Regions:
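N-terminal plug
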Residues: 1, 12, 30-35, 508
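Flexible, glycine/serine/threonine-rich loop segments and coil->beta-strand junctions
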Residues: 1-7, 14-20
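A residue-level signal for beta-strand positions that form part of recognition/binding surfaces
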Residues: 6, 20-22, 142, 354, ...
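Non-catalytic regulatory/gating segments with a bias toward low-complexity or hydrophobic composition
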Residues: 7-9, 573
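Active-site beta-strand termini and strand-to-loop segments that position acidic
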Residues: 11-12, 523
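Residues embedded in well-ordered regular secondary structure
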Residues: 15-157, 195-197, 218-267, 280-283
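Flexible loop and strand-edge segments within Gram-negative outer membrane beta-barrel domains
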Residues: 32, 107-148, 152-159, 167-248, ...
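Extracellular/periplasmic, surface-exposed regions of secreted and cell-surface proteins
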Residues: 163, 169-177, 182-187, 243-307, ...
Length: 614
């Protein structure tokens, strides 16, 4: 636990005094900082014309080389040849003809379609945030409450994010008792678009589609419907040749109209989350306190997508309507943490002793469902019950952690400091005989040279600690069973569903551990105008949790194992200065570090571990 550091989060709490009401808000705009420079319609037509002429020239030169090799006369050709002659010379190679749709642009006609597809999908997106809070209290009761609203449009059309949240904190003190609670509920609504996908699959990525769309095609047809002329086999962009024959298709890259992709598809995610925390504290005596803390984190989300029939089938003659598709996904997470600690603090003639002992329990359960439906008879009802659900899935998993901890700190007049700590963690993810890990740590520091006038503080420190990592799948040690469909017998329709092992168990799996030594010093000079810090560290991680390839005869590809050693060592140095000149303050901070990472051991013979996926 804590092998990658610990983040401490402190929320706003009420202060003693009269009630204070405050408001904070802003309104702003966001835009794409830089668009990609693209050709306009006339430049695009010139480029396509050059490309087709080059293709025609290369094709004819290849044909003539073969004719000469056969002692035959070469064919005469020129880039001014008509499409009919090009087809005759190349035996109907349609890649050599000049698309009819670009001819008006080559002639320089005015007032033709010239679409900037980036301008069509991007926008100046507004965003606003508002927060109202009230806080106050008495010596016995302090409170803080706030209500927040955030609305943010996406820079791509038809995308936005909205969040409603609130926070309530209460602290009550009565004699030797202290009580408090925190509550932070929030609701978010997100309308997303496929901004990162490829232009010709996966629903059509909006940005990629815009960058692949030719500027000679409009966003809308004359009747106001979306133009899908660049969906390669569209009949309204048939190429008519000089002899009257027709080549179906527009000779351009197949791509859906990106504006239609953004506006017609639905991808809405609604989520709610509640962070809650309640604590109680009893001071049995000034030096001895007991504290219990219980926190919860509850998360629920639902995602609904719908792709209407008005987005045509890709690369198909006539732009026929596609079959509508919809998905529904849900996710639930429930996490609770219960902590109990006893602390003792005592000062005796410059000797300060602080001790802590505690016990914690944590549990989390995750659930998810997925359903896919098609066969919708209308685009007006995008819910799954209006179609036919053809596949679905659901998952549930849980994990738990028990921990015991103890810490003792000694301080003598702020000059000598020693800390020792020990924690034991038991994780459900490991085998029943290997769930517990023990993690001790010790540190010491000394402040000296305060007698020198230019030195405000100089502290040397050293520490050693052992931390653990249990971030593996919840059932990584046990192995999982999955359901599969299998064809039995000679009749392919005889599909039988059964269960089979999915992952290879490893009951010997245990904690990955990291032992780290730190040496360093901190200095403050010239009345705290200059501060320095230096850290040297050496970290050894062993029993790494890795997926290791296993022989194929086992029926598995990999097994989770404790294997290998990794060393990290390095240095960090920082220097800062804080200067005040009257009412003017300025500061400078500089930091530099170097880390050396070395894989010391990786299984028998240090063989490489090669795996796919994430």
């Amino acid at each position: 636990r804590g092998s990658n550091g610990v983040v401490m989060v402190t929320t706003k709490r009420g202060q003693e005094g009269r009630a204070t009401v405050s408001y904070n808000g802003y309104y702003g705009w966001q835009t794409v900082s830089k668009k990609i420079d693209m050709l306009n319609a006339y430049e695009y037509a010139d480029l396509v014309n050059d490309a087709r002429n080059n293709t025609y020239t290369d094709k004819m030169e290849s044909i003539n080389r073969k004719l000469i090799a056969q002692n035959k006369n070469p064919l005469s050709f020129d880039i001014s040849d008509s499409n009919a002659i090009r087809l005759q010379n190349t035996s109907n190679d349609y890649n050599t003809i000049v698309p009819v749709e670009i001819l008006p642009y080559l002639r320089g006609e005015k007032g033709l379609v010239d679409t900037d597809w980036q301008d069509e999908i991007f926008r100046t997106a507004g965003m606003q945030s508002h927060s109202v809070s009230v806080s106050g209290g008495s010596p016995k009761i302090r409170y803080y409450a706030s209500v927040d609203y955030l609305s943010q449009e996406g820079v791509i059309i038809n995308s936005d994010f909205t969040r409603y949240s609130s926070r309530f904190n209460l602290d009550v003190t009565e004699g030797i008792f202290k009580f408090g609670l925190s509550l932070n509920p929030s609701v978010t609504i997100e309308n997303a678009v496929n901004s990162d996908g490829a232009y010709n699959k996966d629903g059509g990525g909006i940005i990629a589609s815009a960058l692949h769309s030719a500027p000679i095609f409009p966003v809308y047809n004359a009747d106001g419907s979306f133009c899908f002329a660049q969906n390669a086999w569209s009949p309204n962009t048939q190429t008519t040749l000089e002899d009257g024959s027709v080549k179906k298709g527009n000779s351009q890259t197949q791509v859906w109209n990106p504006v239609a992709l953004a506006l017609l598809q639905k991808d809405e995610t609604k989520a709610s989350r509640i962070f809650g925390n309640v604590y109680g504290e009893v001071a049995f005596m000034p030096e001895l306190k007991y504290r219990a803390n219980f926190g919860i984190d509850i998360y629920n989300s639902s995602q609904d997508t719908f792709r209407p029939s008005t987005i045509p089938v890709a690369n198909t003659e006539g732009n026929p309507e596609s079959e509508p598709e919809a998905t529904a996904k849900t996710a639930k997470m429930y996490n609770w943490l219960f902590e109990q600690t006893m602390t003792y603090n005592k000062d005796i003639k410059g000797h300060s002793i602080s001790a802590l002992a505690g016990w914690t329990m944590q549990y989390q359960r995750d659930e998810s469902t997925y359903a896919f439906a098609n066969g919708f008879i209308t685009n007006n009802v995008p819910t799954l019950n209006a179609g036919t659900v053809t596949r679905g899935d659901s998952h549930a998993s849980e994990w738990a952690l028990l921990s015991g901890l103890a810490r003792v700190q000694y301080n003598y007049k702020g000059k000598y400091m020693v800390t020792g700590a020990l924690r034991a963690d038991g994780a459900s993810r490991f085998g029943k005989d290997n769930r517990w890990g023990w993690f001790p740590s010790v540190s010491a520091g000394e402040s000296f040279m305060k007698s020198l006038t230019f030195i405000d503080d100089l502290k040397l420190r050293a520490s050693y600690g052992l931390t653990g990592n249990f971030r593996i799948p919840n059932y990584g040690a046990q192995g999982e069973v999955a359901y599969y469909s299998y064809v039995l017998g000679g009749n392919s329709a005889d599909v039988v569903k059964g269960a089979a092992p999915k992952s290879m168990p490893n009951p010997e799996l245990h904690w990955e551990k990291t032992a780290q030594v730190n040496l360093g010093f901190d200095a403050s000079l010239f009345k705290n105008r200059l501060t320095l810090g230096l850290d040297l560290y050496n970290s050894n991680t062993y029993d790494l949790l890795l997926d290791v390839p296993v022989p194929m005869m086992t029926g598995y590809q990999t097994r989770l194992e404790n294997i290998g050693k990794v060393n990290n060592k390095g240095v960090e140095f920082n220097i800062a200065t804080n200067q005040k000149m009257g009412d003017f303050n300025w500061s400078v901070y500089f930091n530099i570090s170097k880390n050396i990472n070395e894989v010391k051991e990786l299984g028998p013979g240090n063989a490489d571990i090669i795996s796919s996926g994430s």
